[in-house]
Amino acid sequence: MNVKVENIEKNVVKLEITVDSEKFNEAVKKSFKKNAKRFNVPGFRKGKAPLNIIKKYYGEGVLFEDAINFCCEDTYPKAIEENNIKPVDYPQIDVVQIGEGKDFIYTAEVTTVPKVKLGEYKGVEVKKVSYEVEDEAVENELKSMQEKNARVSLKEEGEIEKGNIAIIDFKGYVDGKAFEGGEAKDYEIEIGSGTFIGDFEDQLVGLKKDESKEVNVSFPEEYGREDLNGKPATFEVTIKDIKVKELPALDDEFAKEVSEFDTLEELKSDIKDRMKKELSEKAKAEYEEAVVEAVGANAEIEIPKVMIEKEIENMVRDLEMRLKYQGLDLKSYYEFTNSSEEKVKEYMRETAEKRVKTDLIMQEIAKVEDIKATEEELKEKAMEVAKQYGQKDVEKTAELIANAQKAYLEIDIVNGKVLDLLVESSKEIA
């Protein structure tokens, strides 16, 4: 095998690979063995005609397609490895020379991993990130707990007031016609919750059980449905029942009922501690992101479009999987969000480019700093992932993961080590 490499443009190379005639003839014979049964030649049982007869009857090129595939599968990986070429996509294969008794020559044009020119990555200055737990946030959490533990009972007499829960039947009309999704029966709505559009809920205040009313509202301009965006609507509403919500008193007894604590002050203290931890983790994540962005701003890199497109495809697949867990599919998602595949992909583009750039920079730093994943770290990471699957035999699952996903585990471990290096060497400024 002989290989010539030509740089035809930035991050794109063309390899001219020559396979000697003897090797190509072996590939033709292999192709014959694979396809012999499909050839039907007069005077021979189907699949029993010898190679030379097949060539005469069908022409020498009849076996070339598979022979080409066999040769490329064997020689292309060797060619890129020997020339230290790291492709990011499948190659474009073109045949230059092919024929009986001739060397087989083909070209493989491929986009390669771009070169990364690192700037300053140690000691980058990043603004300090910190959050304080506000008393209001603690009070809001207590109110939320209070709401969840409220006692709800029927309001036998009287009108709807703010804070009441109304059980309603409704049917909506736009331009005088009923619209899809605009009708429901025995629907519960808390007055003042802002669940419905406009002042729909406010217009129910003062109504009694079994009373009906026409409610007039307008849909927001960006409601998410082209047939409803910005349009006025009329709803026929009937009050089926009214419920009143009684909130429990915020006292020590409440704390005992909803938690492991004996006093309200202990419960408040616990809520504050949990919020501090959450905000500390949030600040840490934001600081790490800022460090990576600062390092990225110092680096020079021209990312091939194909890498961004591949990352977008990965993001779409991830979205599809998340939707599947919710019992949805992409088509339903596009309809619900008034979007399309093209719009979603375009929305993802900036994030995809950022991810690819970050990965390339992290890999380059790992190379410069000689950061690698050890076998012990791989085992630990595989075990960590295996535990998330909830299988009985965690060790066996971890072993399978370590073998099947080794490359992904290595990247995850190495990127984590690089991030630690960048953060530890960074300078926090006010």
From Swiss-Prot:
It comes from the Bacteria. Its main location: cytoplasm. GO terms for molecular function: peptidyl-prolyl cis-trans isomerase activity; protein folding chaperone; ribosome binding. GO terms for cellular component: cytoplasm. The keyword Cytoplasm applies. Coiled coil: none annotated. Keywords: Cell cycle, Cell division, Chaperone, Cytoplasm, Isomerase, Rotamase. Residues 163-248 form the PPIase FKBP-type domain. It is found in: Cytoplasm. It holds the Pfam family Trigger_N. Its EC number is 5.2.1.8. Transmembrane segments: none annotated. It catalyses: [protein]-peptidylproline (omega=180) = [protein]-peptidylproline (omega=0). One of its GO terms (biological process) is protein unfolding. The keyword Chaperone applies. Involved in protein export. Acts as a chaperone by maintaining the newly synthesized protein in an open conformation. Functions as a peptidyl-prolyl cis-trans isomerase. NCBIfam families: tig. Belongs to the FKBP-type PPIase family. Tig subfamily. Consists of 3 domains; the N-terminus binds the ribosome, the middle domain has PPIase activity, while the C-terminus has intrinsic chaperone activity on its own. This is Trigger factor.
